[in-house]
């Protein structure tokens, strides 16, 4: 079955499908989503 293009999770670099039913998109899992949220809260990410 063809789900379309693959992208990489920005946290763990696991490949995921663009059209895959994923509640945590653009991350591969809840864990990666929480890690990203923590990085925003802790100030690792900044908007200029």
Swiss-Prot record:
Organism superkingdom: Bacteria
GO biological process: regulation of DNA-templated transcription
Annotated Gene3D superfamilies: Erythroid Transcription Factor GATA-1, subunit A (3.30.50.10)
SUPFAM superfamilies cross-referenced by the UniProt entry: Glucocorticoid receptor-like (DNA-binding domain) (SSF57716)
Residues at which Zn(2+) binds: 9, 12, 28, 32
Keywords: Metal-binding, Zinc
Cofactor(s) annotated in UniProt: Zn(2+)
InterPro entries reported in the protein's UniProt record: DNA_gyrase_inhibitor_YacG, Znf_NHR/GATA
Cofactor binding, note field: Binds 1 zinc ion.
GO molecular function annotation: DNA topoisomerase type II (double strand cut, ATP-hydrolyzing) inhibitor activity; zinc ion binding
Keyword Signal included in the entry's annotation: no
SUBUNIT field: Interacts with GyrB.
Family: Belongs to the DNA gyrase inhibitor YacG family.
Physiological role: Inhibits all the catalytic activities of DNA gyrase by preventing its interaction with DNA. Acts by binding directly to the C-terminal domain of GyrB, which probably disrupts DNA binding by the gyrase.
Record's protein name: DNA gyrase inhibitor YacG
